[in-house]
UniProtKB/Swiss-Prot annotation:
Molecular-function GO term, any one: ATP binding
The entry's keywords: ATP-binding, Cell membrane, Cytoplasm, Cytoplasmic vesicle, Hydrogen ion transport, Ion transport, Membrane, Nucleotide-binding, Synapse, Transport
Protein origin, superkingdom: Eukaryota
GO biological process, one term: vacuolar acidification
Protein name: V-type proton ATPase subunit B, brain isoform
Any one cellular-component term (Gene Ontology): microvillus
NCBIfam families cross-referenced by the UniProt entry: PRK04196.1, V-ATPase_V1_B
Keyword presence, Metal-binding: no
Topology within the bilayer: Peripheral membrane protein
CDD domains: ATP-synt_V_A-type_beta_C (cd18112), ATP-synt_V_A-type_beta_N (cd18118), V_A-ATPase_B (cd01135)
Name of the gene encoding the protein in the UniProt record: ATP6V1B2
Family: Belongs to the ATPase alpha/beta chains family.
Subunit and partners: V-ATPase is a heteromultimeric enzyme made up of two complexes: the ATP-hydrolytic V1 complex and the proton translocation V0 complex. The V1 complex consists of three catalytic AB heterodimers that form a heterohexamer, three peripheral stalks each consisting of EG heterodimers, one central rotor including subunits D and F, and the regulatory subunits C and H. The proton translocation complex V0 consists of the proton transport subunit a, a ring of proteolipid subunits c9c'', rotary subunit d, subunits e and f, and the accessory subunits ATP6AP1/Ac45 and ATP6AP2/PRR.
Length: 511
């Protein structure tokens, strides 16, 4: 306490007074002191020593004891207030990243207050149903959030030993995902898309339809009130933001949704903190309120480009395509904040959306994302051009946690075998289609023609479905069997004989 009081005197602030240790109001006073100490840090000193402005960065000289990641409040000559964060410290110099941009900052007249605290965001269960900007300020004309807690936006590190392996399948109602790339609760799986493709519609459909597989009471959590969606938009246009907002309102789920919107005309630098604000809110809802949270992050390509802009302003050595060398680590600090924790009922499932520049899956953003996440859902332009919705190409798509989320007791015992056989038949069908373009249909064998028929029916009946068509995983598997009956039993080599004898002869007239 004495040390803190001395530090306050050195920094120009009033020293903290000791709290009396007796009496009925001791608990309340101690709590008030804890709150003021941790969250309402008073500015230490005000500086007018801005020596330069470079892009989103402000450089200050003659700063006493600047600290890394410290929050700085800037006051412009016209009284406008902005906030920033210390990115780099060298002696008495500090490089500050300004979240709202640096336009209008006068080097001689701008004053900077160092708060002595890190960036924290107020969190509360009341944030559900609200809309915030990319800095976490309400933009829905509602009141300021009455905070239950103030949390560091970088999150708390989770002990790997305390993580629980995701094993409960989330039913999205989309056959291409549920049947062949099943998502587990607590998984991180991105949607790899490109400009002009319906990735927003797919994400909205997942939000509308997501729920646990309805199997039996000992497996399924039937309660819907503990489900929440946190949606973070980075660099999207107003049309996309309005699409998601109106979709949530129309299906009646807006009360369970928290939106963070950084639009294309908002400051680029703000995109660095938007996903972290969203994930901090999601962690509070999951681990404190014990809700099952689905986090949608769009567009991660805009986030990575904002990261590149800051890196270029700091004159760091660029990596591939000009992106910083630490982009892999930076993306991991976002994606790894998904999962389940022992002793908590809640979970965080992440579905980041990224648009691949020039449809290039080898671009650094999708390339590094694929290394970190547990699979990907690939949205294909060729399928989209043929009017197939959702245009999900199952061949490059993958779910690494599918094996533990399906099977007897979770979905159905034939799930894995049907998925493997559908993959094999579709891959062979694609090869036959390519061969047909070279040699013509007359040169194909009878088996080849069967694969070609399967290919067309698979895309038309299995992949294609309506945007409001919600298929159960059992309906999806039945459609899969209906397609596999195109082939004689002998050609279905990926399915064990016992499974074939049980499911293959079923009457498919009801489908």
């Amino acid at each position: 306490m004495a040390l803190r009081a001395m530090r306050g005197i050195v920094n120009g602030a009033a020293p903290e007074l000791p709290v009396p240790t007796g009496g009925p109001t001791v608990g309340a006073r101690e709590q008030a002191l804890a709150v003021s100490r941790n969250y309402l840090s008073q500015p230490r000193l005000t500086y007018k020593t801005v020596s330069g402005v470079n892009g989103p960065l402000v450089i200050l000289d003659h700063v006493k004891f600047p600290r890394y990641a410290e929050i700085v409040h800037l006051t412009l000559p016209d009284g406008t207030k902005r906030s920033g964060q210390v990115l780099e410290v060298s002696g008495s110099k500090a490089v500050v990243q300004v979240f709202e941009g640096t336009s209008g900052i006068d080097a001689k007249k701008t004053s900077c207050e160092f708060t002595g605290d890190i960036l924290r965001t107020p969190v509360s269960e009341d944030m559900l149903g609200r809309v915030f900007n990319g800095s976490g300020k309400p933009i829905d004309r509602g009141p300021v959030v009455l905070a239950e807690d103030f949390l560091d936006i970088m999150g708390q590190p989770i002990n790997p030993q305390c993580r629980i392996y995701p094993e409960e399948m989330i039913q999205t109602g989309i056959s291409a995902i549920d049947g062949m790339n099943s998502i587990a609760r607590g998984q991180k799986i991105p949607i790899f898309s490109a400009a002009g493709l319906p990735h927003n519609e797919i994400a909205a459909q997942i939000c509308r339809q997501a729920g646990l597989v309805k199997k039996s009471k000992d497996v399924v959590d039937y309660s819907e009130e503990n489900f929440a969606i946190v949606f973070a938009a980075m660099g999207v246009n107003m049309e996309t933001a309005r699409f998601f907002k109106s979709d949530f309102e129309e299906n009646g789920s807006m009360d369970n949704v928290c939106l963070f919107l950084n639009l294309a005309n908002d400051p680029t630098i703000e995109r660095i903190i938007t996903p972290r604000l969203a994930l901090t809110t999601a962690e509070f809802l999951a681990y404190q309120c014990e809700k099952h949270v689905l986090v949608i992050l769009t567009d991660m390509s805009s986030y990575a480009e904002a990261l590149r802009e800051v890196s270029a302003a700091r004159e760091e050595v660029p990596g591939r395509r000009g992106f910083p060398g630490y982009m892999y680590t930076d993306l991991a600090t976002i994606y790894e904040r998904a999962g389940r924790v022992e002793g908590r009922n809640g979970s965080i499932t992440q579905i980041p959306i990224l648009t691949m520049p020039n449809d290039d899956i080898t671009h650094p953003i999708p390339d590094l994302t694929g290394y970190i996440t547990e699979g990907q859902i690939y949205v294909d332009r060729q399928l989209h051009n043929r009017q197939i919705y959702p245009p999900i190409n199952v061949l490059p798509s993958l779910s690494r946690l599918m094996k533990s989320a399906i099977g007897e007791g979770m979905t159905r015992k034939d799930h894995a075998d049907v998925s493997n056989q559908l993959y094999a038949c579709y891959a062979i069908g694609k090869d036959v289609q390519a061969m047909k373009a070279v040699v013509g249909e007359e040169a194909l064998t009878s088996d080849d023609l069967l694969y070609l028929e399967f290919l067309q029916k698979f895309e038309r009946n299995f992949i294609a479905q309506g945007p409001y068509e919600n298929r159960t995983v059992f309906e999806t598997l039945d459609i899969g069997w209906q397609l596999l009956r195109i082939f004689p039993k002998e050609m279905l080599k990926r399915i064990p004989q016992s499974t074939l004898s049980e499911f293959y002869p079923r009457d498919s007239a009801k489908h």
